[in-house]
Amino acid sequence: MGAMQVTMIDENKYAETMTDVVLPALEQCREEGWFDSSAAERSAGIEPLSGIMDTGGRSGQLHYLCYDSAKFDAIREQGATATFRGAVVISHGFTEFAEKYDELVWYFLLAGYSVCVLEHRGHGKSARDVDDRCMVWIDDWQRYVADLAGFAETIGQQYAAG
């Protein structure tokens, strides 16, 4: 396989390029969903939490965004490889959310990868286990590990299949 070439967004035109090119393209290939992490947590020996309701009645579920490389290739963006290479699952940092990774998602799509971003418990639109929306709390860090592994083995694997 030859070397991949992906052109970075020109910093002098960054805001304009993100607004006029990147975000509209991402919108066309984005799929939003909800992941029920209870099976993954039980499998890891962790009792599932119900989560405090805050979005659409999805008790305990985790929000995610996935970007399909086939749909991206169909819009024929300049610089896209149009060669499916697999899927990438992004695990965001503490107090972050999926959309923070829009630019990175763009580069992976250009390179031929589908991308999935799980919003961990207590982050973004995912279930929270405290009333204070400004506070990120988790009872056991292994819950994050179990949730991400379960997500990668199900949703991520679907996108990796192409």
Language model features by range: what are they?
Residues 81-83, 155-162:
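Glycine-rich phosphate-binding loop signature in dinucleotide/nucleotide-binding domains
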Residues 98, 103-131:
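Conserved alpha/beta-hydrolase
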Residues 72, 110, 157-161:
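Secondary-structure boundary motif
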Residues 63, 93, 100, 147-151:
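Well-ordered alpha-helical segments embedded in enzymatic catalytic cores
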Residues 1-56, 63-70, 74-80:
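An N-terminal hydrophobic leader/cap segment in hydrolases
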Residues 85-96:
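Active-site glycine-rich loops that stabilize anionic/oxyanionic intermediates
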Residues 136-158:
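Alpha/beta-hydrolase active-site loop
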